Swiss-Prot record:
It comes from the Viruses. The gene is NA. This is Neuraminidase. Inhibited by the neuraminidase inhibitors zanamivir (Relenza) and oseltamivir (Tamiflu). These drugs interfere with the release of progeny virus from infected cells and are effective against all influenza strains. Resistance to neuraminidase inhibitors is quite rare. It comes from Influenza A virus (strain A/Goose/Guangxi/345/2005 H5N1 genotype G). Belongs to the glycosyl hydrolase 34 family.
Amino acid sequence: TIGSICMVIGIVSLMLQIGNMISIWVSHSIQTGNQNQVEPISNTNFLTEKAVASVTLAGNSSLCPIRGWAVHSKDNSIRIGSKGDVFVIREPFISCSHLECRTFFLTQGALLNDKHSNGTVKDRSPHRTLMSCPVGEAPSPYNSRFESVAWSASACHDGTSWLTIGISGPDNGAVAVLKYNGMITDTIKSWRNNILRTQESECACVNGSCFTVMTDGPSNGQASYKIFKMEKGKVVKSVELDAPNYHYEECSCYPDAGEITCVCRDNWHGSNRPWVSFNQNLEYQIGYICSGVFGDNPRPNDGTGSCGPVSPNGAYGVKGFSFKYGNGVWIGRTKSPNSRSGFEMIWDPNGWTETDSSFSVKQDIVAITDWSGYSGSFVQHPELTGLDCIRPCFWVELIRGRPKESTIWTSGSSISFCGVNSDTVSWSWPDGAELPFTIDK
C-alpha cells in the first residue's frame, strides 16, 4: 500500500542520515588525530636539520696543493651603484662557513651617487657599520645584514655560528664589541688608547676556537700587538707579542694543520711583510717573509730580501697576504711598486726562508693601469668543499674615487680567487666603473 511504501522510504532516509552523521564524526576524528600528530613530527624534523647544520670546523687539515688561482667572485658594485642602491664601502673581506661564503664590508652609512657619500674618504666615523651579503652580490640595503657598529672589523664562523668583531669609539679609547650568533658576548677595551684596530679580514677558527690579532699604538713606530683566543664569542686567553722592531697591522690569518699563520702589514719601516704563527695555546713564532720579491706597497724594486724588515720604501703600506707552503710562499701584491694599482700572484718556491728574488710562477689578476687596494686571505674548509684539505683563497679590493679620482666619495668593489690544482689563466678583472657619477658633477 501507499502507507507501507512511505514508511519504508522514511526508514531508509533515516538510516542514510544516521550513516552520514557517523561518516562526518569518523572523518572529524581522523583529522583531529592527524593534527595532534603533526607537531611532534615537525619538531623532530626541525631539530634534525639544526643538528646537521651545526658542525665544528676542525682546521686540522693542511692547505690544499695548488698550481694557480681560479676566479671565484666579482661584485661590480661601483658599476651597479651608478644607477642602483649600493652602499658606499671600504675594507671588504670574505669569510665562509660550512654552508656559504659571505662578503663583509664597512659601510659609510651612505649610498653611492647620493649626497651622504660626500667625504667618505675618512676611515673612522660613528656612521660606519659592519654588514654582510652573499658573496658576489653588490652590497645594498636589500640584500645586506647588519652585523656590528664598526670602523675596524673581523668575522669568522666556527661551524655553529658567526663571530663578529666590531671596533668603534674615539681614537683614544675605542672598544671592540664581540658578537656570537648576533648577540653581544664580550668586549675588548683599547689598552694603549691609540686607535685599537684589527684585521679587516676573517679571523681563523680551529676546533671550535677562533683567533684574531689586534694592534694598539702608533702607525709609524713601535706599537703593541695581541693575539686573542675566543670561544663562543668570549675571550678565553690573550697574549701580547714580544716583538721589538716589528710592526703588525691588518693581519691576514688562516688555519693550516691545526695552527694559525698571519701575514700582516708593516706600516713603520718594512716593505716586506711580517708574520706571526701560533698554536691553539697561543705559543707563537714571529718573523718577516725573507723573499726578495717584496709584498708591500710602496716598496723598492725586487732584489735581495731580508728575514727582518726591509727598510727602503718601508714607511706606509697596504693590507695584504701570503700563503706559506713549507719554505715556499705564494705572494699577492700590487703590480705597481708605488701606487695601489694592478695585482699579481707570485710563487717563490723558497721565499719564506731565502732572500733571493727568483720565482717560478706569476699570475696576473688586475692590470697595472687599473686601481686595486687592500687584499686579504680567506679559506674554505673541507666541511664546505668536500675536499680533504683547506682551500686557500684571497680577495682584492678595487678602490675607486678619492683621493686618486675626481669624485666626492671613496668606495670599492671586490674580486676573489681560490687556489686550484688545475689550469688557470692570467687576465685583468678591473672594477670597470666609468667616473665621475652624476653627484660629482
